[in-house]
Amino acid sequence: MSLFSIIKDCGGIHNIQRVLIPDSRIIIEIHEFELLSAEAKQQAYNLTLKQVTYQQTVIENKDEFGAQLLEIGQLISDQQRQDITPYTAPVECEFRPDWHISPPQGLLNDPNGFIYHQGQYHLFYQWYPYTCVHKDKYWAHLTSKDLVNWQWQPVALTPSDWFDSYGVFSGHAISQDDLLMLFYTGNVRIGEQRDRHTTQCLATSTDGIHFTKQGPVVPELPPGVTPHCRDPKVIRHNDRWLMLLGVQREDEIGRLAIYHSEDLKTWTFIALCGDELGDFGYMWECPDFFTLNQQDFIVIGPQGIRSPDKSHTAPHHNGIVKAQLETSGKALLSDFQPLDYGFDFYAPQSLETPDGRRIMCAWMGLPDEIDHPSADNGWVHQLTTMRELSYDNGALIQKPIKELATLRHTPIVLSKDETSFDLHSKAFELQVSMQWGSVLRLHQSESGYCEIRLDSASRRLYIDRSNTLIREGDTVREMSLAESDSVQLHIFSDTSSLEVFINEGEAVMSARVFTDKNSTQLSFDGDVQIQACWLLNKASAPFIS
């Protein structure tokens, strides 16, 4: 019996939710039982999962069977694209950002495939379009000429195939001449116990818009690793390709798995790396790799480590380690430091611009925090602003990209004799110098505000959003600063977010800040000098036109 005959017996392609092929079985998940043929109804059926199982299926021609699977996956994808069309139109919401990337509807999380290819920037992100939950992820696709104004493109990848039908999970991109290659993790769940199966997959495009799935290129797990194995980052190093994967060892310790390849299609395992960091979290997610000023760095998201900030209770962290790549491809890691000391920064990705700058953006959210006020309007989360990374005198420096200056409206002149101002907007850029013991309040009205304060005794900077509309997650973040007479802050504000660059980029703190639409005032106590202020224009909306 051919696979197409099975699909026909199961009610046709429009009745198919997904196809799974564990072991020698073929499992067809359907929408309506009544559409099954009499023969299909004789097969084992799981009422809870709505799955028909064909046992002990003999596959005589594996190449033909594989081609049929990809063809059926494409048909399912075509249907999925039709189904999500109403969800590509943005819903109105008072918390919608003016110049950050947010989803039209549904849930956004990790940025993916951030790359410069054929004269423009490409940025994808994890997206579940239907509701604000983590489920069956798609890859939304945006393009830009300037890293500020983004245009919606057709969804790049949908969860349509036997190897990714429970989610086209995160990954990176490679630009090879005219070919744009997307490496990602295919996520599959089997049975009522939801056994996880993960493979590392490839999709390619010759026009940068329409992608063809090639299937798994790393079909097996690394030795000694659980199915928590994901988020491929592919780099060119020593004249060969390396793939970095975030993994969990079988003893529930997070590590980095490294593979090598000559052709980007056949991959060989090298090693698990990171033992020198010890017991450093139960899982590492979303690796990235780049070189700054001749120093190699690897970004990891270690889950379950202890934060030096006692007010940081979430298990999810992001940071950067120095990396020493050996000729074999194995990496030695050292000197972990956070990339962001705020509330909302996870799963960052970076690219190199044509003029040689390293630019990074991240998900401005965390995996366990979904109940934001915007969810009442059917969407949740946004990406951070783009930041430029450099490495000078042994210090990582992060600054807002220069292109953001194009958003500046007429400068706002604030009186030195006043301590409270109404900007009549939440979208602004602010440069201030604060003395120890001073307090700055932003997004302020009678109903609430977000506060930045410098504690003289502890020499710590605090961001406090406890007087906002936040529903879940921590409300205070803090960090120690070096001895100085004053602290320089470069603040970028949008409708429901703040990003604070500290002391010329020595540290950054990012926060989602939800306040009512009238919360457009700023005020301060103590010695605060406002050096510059601009209202920011809207960027082009990153939605379908």
From Swiss-Prot:
Catalytic activities: Hydrolysis of terminal non-reducing beta-D-fructofuranoside residues in beta-D-fructofuranosides
One GO term describing the cellular component: cytoplasm
Location in the cell: Cytoplasm
Residues at which substrate binds: L107, L108, N109, D110, Q126, F169, S170, R230, D231, E285
SMART domains attached to this UniProt entry: Glyco_32 (SM00640)
Keyword Phosphoprotein among record annotations: no
Residue stretches spanning the membrane: none
InterPro entries in alphabetical order: ConA-like_dom_sf (IPR013320), GH32_Enzymes (IPR051214), Glyco_hydro_32 (IPR001362), Glyco_hydro_32_AS (IPR018053), Glyco_hydro_32_C (IPR013189), Glyco_hydro_32_N (IPR013148), Glyco_hydro_beta-prop_sf (IPR023296), Suc6P_hydrolase (IPR006232)
Cross-referenced SUPFAM superfamilies: Arabinanase/levansucrase/invertase (SSF75005), Concanavalin A-like lectins/glucanases (SSF49899)
GO MF, any single term: beta-fructofuranosidase activity
GO BP annotations listed: sucrose metabolic process
Pfam families, per the entry: Glyco_hydro_32C (PF08244), Glyco_hydro_32N (PF00251)
EC number: 3.2.1.26
PROSITE patterns: GLYCOSYL_HYDROL_F32
Hydrolase keyword on record: yes
Record-linked CDD domains: GH32_ScrB-like
Summary of the function given for this chain in its UniProt record: Enables the bacterium to metabolize sucrose as a sole carbon source.
Protein family according to the UniProt entry: Belongs to the glycosyl hydrolase 32 family.
Record-linked NCBIfam families: scrB_fam
Protein name (Swiss-Prot/TrEMBL): Probable sucrose-6-phosphate hydrolase
